[in-house]
C-alpha cells in the first residue's frame, strides 16, 4: 500500500509539473499570436504611410502600448508537451511585454520580421503642407478646383456659342501686316519662326472664319440691313407674301391675320398690311440661325 501511495504521489507531482509546463506553453503560444497580430497592424500602418505619403491618422505606437498579451493562467489546451524549453519561455516572457526586436524565438522557432526602411515622415509634411490634410480625398479637391465656374444649363450648345463669338470678332490681317512692317528693322533671330507661324495660323483662321460666315449669315450686317429678320426665309419678296395673305383673308371673309400670335388690324388698315408689320415688329432676340448652325 505504501508503495502504491508513493507512486500516486509521484504521479500527482509529475501531473502538476506537466500542468505547469502546459500553462507556460499556453502563455507562450498566446504571446506569440499577440505579437503576430501586432506585427500585422504595424505592417498595415507602414503600408498606409507609404501609400498616403504622410503620417497615418492613428499613431502607430498606440496599439503597441495599449495592447498587451493576456496572461492565460487558468486556461489549458491540447498542446504538445516538451515543445518549448524553459530558456525559450524565459526569453519570450522578457520580450513579449515591451517593444519587439527584429528576430525572436518562439517555441524553438524564429519569427523574423521583414527589414523595414526608415521613412522620412516630417519632410514630406513640411514640403507639401495643406495637401496632406486629406490625402485620400484628392478626387473631391480636383472636382472642386475644376468646378469653380457656373454649371452649364441643359440644352446649351457651348461649342456653337464659342465659335459664334469667334466669328463675330474682327479680322486681324491688317493689324498683323502693320506690325510686321513696323518691326521689319529688328533682327530676325529667334522671333522669325514664331512670327511666321502666327501669321500662317492667322491666315488659316481667317479663311476658316470666312468659310463659316459664308455658311452662317453675318448677324450684325443682316440686322442693319433688315432689322426685322427672324427666319431664314426673310429674303423672300414682300409683294408675293402680301398677295398670299390677301387671298387667305378674302377666302375666309374676315380681316384677321392667319398667324395666331399677330394682333388684329385696325379699321383703317387692311389685313394685307397688318400681317407683314406683325412679322417685322416681332422681337429679334432669338435667332434660329445663330442658335442651331453647328
From Swiss-Prot:
**Composition bias, Basic residues:** 241-253
Determine if Metal-binding is one of this entry's keywords. no
Q: Does the keyword Endoplasmic reticulum apply?
A: no
Keyword line:
Nucleus
InterPro entries named among the record's database cross-references: FAM212, Inka
Q: Where is this region: Inka box?
A: 134-177
**One of the record's GO cellular component terms:** nucleus
TM region(s), chain numbering? none
Q: In which residue ranges is the amino acid composition biased (Polar residues)?
A: 85-99
Residues annotated as coiled-coil are none
**Disordered, as annotated region:** 50-143, 170-198, 223-290
Query: What residue spans carry the Basic and acidic residues bias annotation?
Result: 171-198
Q: What does this protein do?
A: Inhibitor of the serine/threonine-protein kinase PAK4. Acts by binding PAK4 in a substrate-like manner, inhibiting the protein kinase activity.
The family this protein is said to belong to: Belongs to the INKA family.
Q: How does it assemble?
A: Interacts with PAK4.
UniProt note: domains: The Inka box (also named iBox or inca box) binds and inhibits PAK4 by binding a substrate-like manner.
Which named protein is this? Answer: PAK4-inhibitor INKA2
Amino acid at each position: 500500500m505504501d508503495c502504491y501511495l508513493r507512486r500516486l504521489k509521484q504521479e500527482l507531482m509529475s501531473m502538476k509539473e506537466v500542468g505547469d509546463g502546459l500553462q507556460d506553453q499556453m502563455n507562450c503560444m498566446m504571446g506569440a499570436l499577440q505579437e503576430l497580430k501586432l506585427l500585422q497592424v504595424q505592417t498595415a500602418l507602414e503600408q498606409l504611410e507609404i501609400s498616403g505619403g504622410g503620417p497615418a491618422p492613428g499613431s502607430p505606437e498606440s496599439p503597441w502600448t495599449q495592447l498587451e498579451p493576456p496572461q492565460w493562467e487558468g486556461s489549458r489546451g491540447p498542446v504538445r508537451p516538451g515543445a518549448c524549453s524553459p530558456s525559450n519561455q524565459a526569453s519570450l516572457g522578457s520580450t513579449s511585454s515591451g517593444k519587439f526586436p527584429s528576430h525572436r524565438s518562439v517555441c524553438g522557432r524564429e519569427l523574423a520580421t521583414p527589414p523595414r526602411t526608415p521613412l522620412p515622415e516630417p519632410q514630406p509634411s513640411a514640403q507639401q503642407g495643406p495637401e496632406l490634410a486629406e490625402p485620400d480625398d484628392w478626387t473631391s479637391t480636383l472636382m472642386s478646383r475644376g468646378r469653380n465656374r457656373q454649371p452649364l444649363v441643359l440644352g446649351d450648345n457651348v461649342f456653337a456659342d464659342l465659335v459664334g463669338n469667334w466669328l463675330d470678332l474682327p479680322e486681324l490681317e491688317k493689324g498683323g501686316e502693320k506690325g510686321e512692317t513696323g518691326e521689319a528693322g529688328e533682327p530676325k533671330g529667334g522671333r522669325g519662326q514664331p512670327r511666321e507661324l502666327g501669321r500662317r495660323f492667322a491666315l488659316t483662321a481667317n479663311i476658316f472664319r470666312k468659310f463659316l460666315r459664308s455658311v452662317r449669315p453675318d448677324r450684325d450686317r443682316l440686322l442693319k440691313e433688315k432689322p426685322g429678320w427672324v427666319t431664314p426665309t426673310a429674303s423672300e419678296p414682300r409683294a408675293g407674301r402680301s398677295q398670299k395673305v390677301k387671298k387667305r383673308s378674302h377666302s375666309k371673309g374676315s380681316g384677321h391675320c392667319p398667324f395666331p400670335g399677330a394682333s388684329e388690324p385696325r379699321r383703317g388698315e387692311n389685313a394685307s398690311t397688318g400681317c407683314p408689320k406683325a412679322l417685322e415688329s416681332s422681337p429679334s432676340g432669338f435667332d434660329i440661325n445663330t442658335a442651331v448652325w453647328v
